[in-house]
């Protein structure tokens, strides 16, 4: 019953397993459905914001690199939310089911609570509740990580240092 529910929710797909010389009904395996589920990754850096829609296998669906002026009359939090909204409008034809938003940026960050205490280059950032504001705005979970920590973790999991002890 649970497999049927997962199939109906498009979480998994059935995959027929062919074994040479086997008899009877062929075995049916399950694979995770990754293409219909997306997450938005955001990287904020000096003067730029990168927004990338990816499926759950991390395959890139669409990406934008946009200017993010260091000084503006509009607070950075409002500008990020505006950029996310405009990204979704521009690429609504490619957007499937959005599961979450992942953000990397430099600065002093409370990753548990999604608060950016300070951020280099953007002087208006002081105790910015980026995670909470974006989660309330979009309705999906938001995860924030320091950019260097995220890059280090990605290198350890998927890069040349994969499987290394130190």
Describe these PLM feature segments.
Residues 2-4:
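Short, hydrophobic-biased segments on the C-terminal half of alpha helices
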Residues 65, 69-166:
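Glycine-rich phosphate-binding loop and adjoining helix at the ATP-binding site
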Residues 9-17:
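A short, conserved structural fragment
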Residues 9, 57, 112-113:
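Residue-level recognition of short loop/turn positions
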Residues 26-63:
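Gly/Thr-rich phosphate-binding beta-strand-loop-beta motif of the actin/hexokinase/Hsp70
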Residues 17-39, 146-166:
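Conserved phosphate-binding catalytic cores of ATP/NTP-utilizing and phosphoryl-transfer enzymes
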Residues 21, 48, 60, 110, ...:
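Flexible, glycine-rich phosphate/dinucleotide-binding loops
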